[in-house]
Amino acid sequence: MKIKITSGNNYAVLGLDGAMLNSLNKNGTEYLWQGNSKYWAGQAPVCFPITGVLPNGEMEAFGKKCTMKRHGVARINPFEVDEQCKNSVTFVQHSNENTKREFPFDYELKIKYTICGDTVTNE
């Protein structure tokens, strides 16, 4: 499912999969890489709880060892819409059975995207 937020002639499109920004359009011009599987099919992933890769693919925290894919668990797991209006959307992801396979901790991750004029912010 895709969510579109707008401000005048400008808009952003975001997906529930990883709360990823899929499109950033200002006055009819697309400003975000649209993906090409020949090079890189992704766009603007949310990296949580890490960015990049772990040394040897492993980490230990609070006595728990885990292995984690590049850029963490958020980008490969779905989010839900927590709040939405014309120019903003807040996504939420809670730890679950899938995320705990790689990141064995409870969490709640909220990400809010807002478009105002020609500016998109995320918190």
Task: Give the location of each predicted region.
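Surface-exposed acidic/polar loop and edge beta-strand patches at domain peripheries
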Residues: 1-121
